[in-house]
Structure formats: structure tokens, C-alpha cells
Amino acid sequence: GSAVAADAFPNRPITIVVPFAAGGETDLVARMLADGMSKELKQVMVVQNIVGASGVAGISAVTGAKPDGYTLGVTPSAPLAMHPHMRKVPYTLDSFDFVGRILKAPYIVMVAKTAPWNTLDDMLRDMKANPNTFFFASSGVGSVPYFAMMDLFKKAGAQVRHVPFSGDADAFQAIAGNRVQVYTSTAGSLDQYDVKGLALMDATRDPLLPNLPTVKESGVEAYYSQWMPLLAPKGLPADVKATLSDAMRKAMQSPEFVERLHKLNLVPGYLDSKDCRAFVEEESVRNAEVIKGLMAK
């Protein structure tokens, strides 16, 4: 029996690769999950940041690793479900086994606190009445905020001009200076910047923001969220996957984990391995259609 016990997974530290810099949202969430799971697994979990090529470098480090459960990854949605429809990347969804989904944070349509609009309908009415007069910000052509805004305005029948920025901070600065009027980001930005939310880009309201209406309530079905799975290279043994899934689920149920997520204005959105894969595939298909529609000139 002792030989079997010695081989029991995990018997050495586990690495979680994050394809973005330390201190960013993905990194913080991965570290929280690593803390919680290491307690459940009674084993060290280390987060390794492998940055480059908009996430491709880190994700390739996961797909290139042995599928033994000792190399995992946490990534936001774009590199998995958006970038592959825009350019060649060295992986597909079939390159991974999904341990589970950590969270789903819908994007929010945001304007300056001083903006004249208090509802999405107010804003869209003005934008439709004055085509190409207003500007929306994005964190670059091809980013999730870019497609979210493009899709929203297309579905609402409004013509709004686009100004790309290098990231959230620059975009919100431009909103404060009224150089652009609208942007979309996740709930954390509501506290961080001088903005108000007009609508949640989802079909149902956020439990942390019960007073924020959804885009669906305005009749515009443009749904976008930032979501993160815990993934592994394809071919994870079933028992290893079960052990990891179990540890993940238990870690995410701990009050400490939930509280730490709430501090980032995020809510746990756990899905098990099977449901996570179905969710990611569905998002990918939807994004492919939107991208095709918007890229077709």
C-alpha cells in the first residue's frame, strides 16, 4: 500500500500559469484560488506569470506541459474564446481539459457621473438622434470591450464613433474629460473611477448590484462578460481531474474566498468541468458569429 500512497496526487507542488502580469485581476483571482486549493490538497500551489502575445505565451506554456495535474492555468476569456477567431493561435479549445469555471463578471455600460443620461435608453435615444456625434472608448480593436460596444450599438441601431485606448485607466480618463462618452468594464471600475453604470451586459441582474438594470431590459441582447476557467493540458487522468475539481469546488465555497472575490466586486461563478466546457464552447461560437458580422465590411 505504501507505494500507492507515495504516488497519490498531488505529491509535489502544483503550478498555476497566469498569462498576464502580477497584480492584475486574473493574477489576483489565481492567487486566491491557489491559496484555497492548496489548503484542500495539502500541497503547495505556486502562481507563475508568463506574459506575452496577449496571453498566447502563457496559454502555450499550459498546452505544452505534461497532462499530469502539476501544470494548470487561469486565463480570462479573450485568449480562449475571442482571439482564435481573429488570428492564428497555437491552440484550440480541444487543447485543454477544464477543471472548472471560477467566475463570470458581466461587462457594464459606463458613462461619466456628470453625463446627462441615467438609463441606457436615454443614452441610446440621444445617440440615435445624433449619428456619429458621440464616441465610445475601447481597450483596442479586437478587445472584448470593443466587440461588446460595437455589438450593442449595432443591435440598438446607433452610429457611434470608436476611439481606442491602451487600457482601462486611459479610457476612463478620456471619459472624465468628455473626449469619449461611453466605455464598458466590469464592476470593479465603478468604485475605482468617477463613472456610473447604465446597464449590465447580461440577461439577469448581478446580486452585488441589484439596482443596475440589464441590457435585456432595454431590449438589446448584447451579452458580454469577463470569465475565468481553471484549465489543464488535454489528457488529464480522470482521478487527477476529480481531485482537482473537488479541491476547487471546496476552496470556492469557503467564506474567505467569497469575501476576497467580493472585495474585487466579483462573485463566484463555479461550474464543474463538464458545464465549464459547454459554457466556454457556447461563448466561443457566439463570439465567432459577432466577430464575423462586425469584421465583414
Predicted segments with their positions:
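An extracytoplasmic/periplasmic, membrane-proximal ligand-sensing/linker region
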Residues: 11-13, 154-160, 238-297
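Ligand-binding "clamshell"
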Residues: 68, 84-97, 158-159, 192-203, ...
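N-terminal (or domain-start) structured segment
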Residues: 4-95, 132-133, 141, 145, ...
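Hinge/capping helix and adjacent helix->loop/strand transition within the periplasmic-binding protein
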Residues: 37, 64-70, 77, 84-166, ...
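Phosphate-coordinating loops and pocket residues in cytosolic domains that bind phosphorylated ligands
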Residues: 11, 64, 88, 125, ...
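Structural signal for conserved beta-strand scaffold positions within catalytic alpha/beta enzyme cores
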Residues: 49, 74, 98-101, 138, ...
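Residue-level signal for the nucleotide or nucleotide-sugar donor/cofactor binding architecture
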Residues: 118, 170, 210, 235-240, ...
